[in-house]
A protein has these predicted regions:
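C-terminal alpha-helical "lid/dimerization" subdomain adjacent to the S-adenosyl-L-methionine
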Residues: 6, 13-19, 132-162
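A short acidic, Gly/Pro-enriched loop at the edge of an enzyme's catalytic core
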Residues: 90-102
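A short glycine-rich, Lys/Arg-flanked "PGG" loop and its adjoining helix->strand segment in the class I
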Residues: 115-127
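Conserved alpha-helix/loop element of class I SAM-dependent methyltransferases that forms part
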Residues: 16-36, 46
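A short SAM/SAH-binding and catalytic strip from SAM-dependent methyltransferases
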Residues: 100-113
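N-terminal, positively charged/glycine-rich alpha-helical extensions of SAM-dependent methyltransferases
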Residues: 1-10, 21-23
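Class I SAM-dependent methyltransferase SAM/SAH-binding core
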Residues: 38-40, 44-91
Length: 162
């Protein structure tokens, strides 16, 4: 893992993703989580303050140890017991059908093999379980979409693969 990926990117992403508008979206996405919960791409722990009060345990995964280091304070402040795995989303060390809810917020874009990660999430989700997610994508507006395509090579460098 590069110095940028481990030390600089986590702080940059934490700053960019901690806006008030993002917090509102996080709260909405997490409002209905119950039971055994798995969060893929926990990042710097920005979701932690938005979990409902009844959540007492959470299992998380993120391949970036620098992100996980920044998440420690938010995890401690949340009072939620966390079991964390420093792994990518394509091969999760969890038993089949072991979670009632899976949380994924602005994460899929950073996973090299999205299809495999989605298969893994489905594998660990119990029958009738729910995926709570939010993701960004291409704009509806053609002009904006063109700019998104032009800026993608730069974005992938600055955002560590996103």
């Amino acid at each position: 893992m590069s110095i940028y990926s481990r030390y600089i990117f986590p702080r940059l992403m934490d700053f960019v993703m901690s806006s008030g508008q993002m917090s509102k979206v996080r709260a909405a996405v997490l409002s209905g989580v119950t039971g055994e919960i798995f969060e893929i791409g926990v990042g710097t722990g920005l979701n932690m303050p938005h979990y409902p009060k009844h959540v007492t345990h959470l299992t998380t995964a993120d391949p970036n140890a620098g992100m996980s280091k920044l998440a420690r304070n938010r995890i401690a402040e949340s009072g939620i017991q966390v079991t964390h795995y420093t792994v990518g989303g394509e091969s999760l060390p969890c038993k089949d059908e072991s979670f009632d809810c899976v949380v994924c917020t602005w994460t899929l874009c950073s996973i090299p093999n999205v299809e495999q990660a989605l298969r893994e999430l489905r594998r660990i989700l119990r029958p009738g379980g729910k995926l709570h997610f939010v993701e960004h994508g291409l704009a509806d507006d053609e002009g904006v979409r063109r700019w998104q395509h032009r800026l993608t090579p730069i974005q992938k460098i600055v955002s560590d693969g996103c």
